Regions:
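Negatively charged, low-complexity tracts enriched in Asp/Glu with abundant Ser/Thr
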Residues: 1-24
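Generic early N-terminus positional signal peaking at residue ~5-7
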Residues: 3-7, 30, 84
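Intrinsically disordered, low-complexity segments enriched in Ser/Pro/Gly/Ala and basic residues
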Residues: 11-12, 19, 35, 45, ...
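Active-site metal-binding core of divalent-cation-utilizing nuclease and nuclease-like domains
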Residues: 26-28
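A short, structured beta-strand/loop element
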Residues: 31-55
Length: 86
């Protein structure tokens, strides 16, 4: 199940959300070649970031999917924690 499916399933009960995924490559200094994988959960009504999870590492194409999957699980957990605390 993808993060979009989770947001679609629970969005009506916990508010509308947008999900953004970004990969940033550091091309300077001692961390040249390091990528930061980031997923942000946005509140669609207020246009504010609710939660962010990220992972920084030297990554090969074979492991990229595993990292994004782990980040999606992390943001799903944070999404439910955020609304459970309200």
């Amino acid at each position: 199940m993808t993060l979009e499916h989770i947001v679609d399933m629970y969005g009506s009960s916990i508010g509308k959300h947008l999900v953004s995924r970004r990969v940033e490559m550091n091309n300077e200094g001692p961390f040249k070649g390091v990528k930061t994988y980031r997923i942000e959960l946005w509140d669609a009504d207020s246009h504010e970031i609710i939660e962010t999870v990220e992972r920084t590492a030297h990554i090969t194409l074979e492991t990229k999917g595993c990292i994004m999957e782990a980040l999606e699980l992390g943001i799903i957990r944070k999404m439910f924690e955020h609304y459970a605390s309200k």
